[in-house]
């Protein structure tokens, strides 16, 4: 199935992309027009008005809600995403709230987990979009995460 072209960039199966959260969200919804998806997001899924049937939504929150994943439980985040990648031949993953994962664990732990996911995704036809807010990270963290993943920015972003 065709992969959407977003901001002049062609997404490729088996790759992980780093995008600002707003761009990641809009790109994810374009993908889910033709693919199944999983989204780990900061917004409570029950408040989303335009939910898609093809998407499983998980809430990155310490809430006891059945659809919540605690930001300190990086193993559960990894497990949900790697299980999705194994179970779906063509799919898309959206992971938002990197700063919440870092606060719940550590930057080193999050980077290690994202690197493992990148390796797993590279063997599939999955596309993974990581939404992040560059302003919420220390410069050294931002430099490290931006060196690990292909970055997609809008022309007006720095």
Segments predicted by a language model, with ranges:
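Substrate-engagement module of ASCE P-loop NTPases
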Residues: 111-136
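Well-ordered, non-membrane alpha-helical segments in soluble/globular domains
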Residues: 74-79, 108-115
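Conserved P-loop NTPase "ATPase switch" module shared by AAA+ and STAND
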Residues: 15-20, 89-106
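Short, solvent-exposed loop/turn segments at secondary-structure boundaries
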Residues: 69-72, 104-108
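Conserved P-loop
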Residues: 1-76
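Structural recognition of the conserved hydrophobic beta-strand(s) that form the central parallel beta-sheet
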Residues: 39-41, 94-95, 126-133
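Conserved alpha-helical scaffold flanking the Walker A/P-loop in AAA+ ATPase domains
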Residues: 77-88
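A short helix-turn-beta junction within AAA+ P-loop NTPase domains corresponding to the substrate/partner-engaging
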Residues: 141-158
